[in-house]
A protein has these predicted regions:
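Catalytic-pocket segment enriched in acidic/His residues
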Residues: 5, 9-10, 46-50, 57-64, ...
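Short, structured patches in soluble enzyme cores that scaffold and shape functional sites
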Residues: 102-104, 111, 118, 125-129, ...
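Structural signature of FAD isoalloxazine-binding scaffolds in flavoprotein oxidoreductases
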Residues: 92-110, 123-125, 260-271
Length: 285
């Protein structure tokens, strides 16, 4: 299944994508939230659709898409998880996953604008594969970690490099501004992705290809990440793990290049859809 959410900010409704159409699932009576995943929501939704899908109203594709999941308890990001990205950042390849949090208030829809923060000079892009947790996970082993995964999303881990690297490194500070976590368009359930470790991911700025790689280049794979993180915190249903970005970010270019007011970002991952975001100065929206 491909889950989506749609509607004006603060009044989003649940839906699905089916055969190229967006369908309103409001009649199901639940949003795609922690409670939904916690209570076997995907299985219940699939069963409900068997007898109700023909009744669902089609959504006009001019409608705003929101994040495909309701605000989760956590957005956990993994740093330097592609070897060439570590090299372009001038940092050694990590021996264990580098973890940091991204404020959930940064979450937004896949076509919402990127807001360049006040006093920002180095707002950057990062295409990433995001993993959505399907059930509570604590101290789990790598061998069964995939049992805890609900599905996958496309994520732009927007970053402000000056904020991030200031005073020796404050990653959460450089990752958590408003609209710094465009997610979606869809949550694609794991049964639809045959091999999440062989997906092309790419990103363009103003039509120019900046990132073009494959998840086969991940330093730490998804089972390793899910298991590792669960040793240090409880993962709740709906939590997002963003698995890192490949090379081609603005920071690594010579000279570096960053987003300016009016720039357009387009990104995609095989099977997960395409997103587009336009950058705006914070005080010009």
């Amino acid at each position: 299944m491909k889950l989506l959410r749609f509607g004006k900010n603060g009044n989003e409704k649940p839906g699905i994508e089916l055969e190229g159409k967006w369908l309103d699932c409001s009649a199901f009576g639940e949003d795609w939230s922690e409670e939904f995943f916690e209570n076997n929501g995907l299985e219940r939704l699939e069963k409900w659709l068997e007898t109700n899908v023909h009744k669902l109203q089609e959504i006009n594709k001019k409608t705003r898409l929101a994040s495909p999941i309701k605000r989760p308890s956590k957005i956990i990001c993994v740093g330097l998880n592609y070897s060439l990205h570590a090299k372009e950042s001038g940092m050694p390849l990590p021996e264990v996953p580098i973890l940091f949090m991204k404020a959930t208030s940064s979450l937004c829809g896949p076509y919402d604008p990127i807001l360049i923060p006040k006093n920002s000079t180095k707002t950057d892009w990062e295409v990433e594969l995001a993993v959505v947790i399907g059930k509570k996970a604590s101290y789990i082993g790598k061998e069964n970690a995939m049992d805890y995964v609900a599905g996958y999303c496309l994520h732009n881990d927007v970053s402000e490099r000056d904020f991030q690297l200031h005073h020796g490194g404050q990653w959460v500070k450089g990752k958590s501004a408003d609209h710094f976590a465009p997610l979606g368009p869809y949550l694609v359930t794991k049964d639809e992705i045959i091999n999440p470790h062989n997906l092309r991911l790419w990103l363009k700025v103003n039509g120019q290809m900046m990132q073009d790689s494959n998840t086969s280049d991940l330093v730490f794979d998804i089972p390793t990440l899910v298991s590792y993180i669960s040793q240090y915190m409880t993962l709740l249903p709906g939590d997002v793990i963003s698995t890192g970005t490949p090379s081609g970010v603005g920071l690594g270019l010579k000279p570096p290049r960053y987003l300016s007011h009016g720039d357009e970002v387009e990104l995609g991952i095989d099977g997960l859809g395409v997103a587009k975001q336009k950058a705006y100065d914070y005080d010009k929206v």
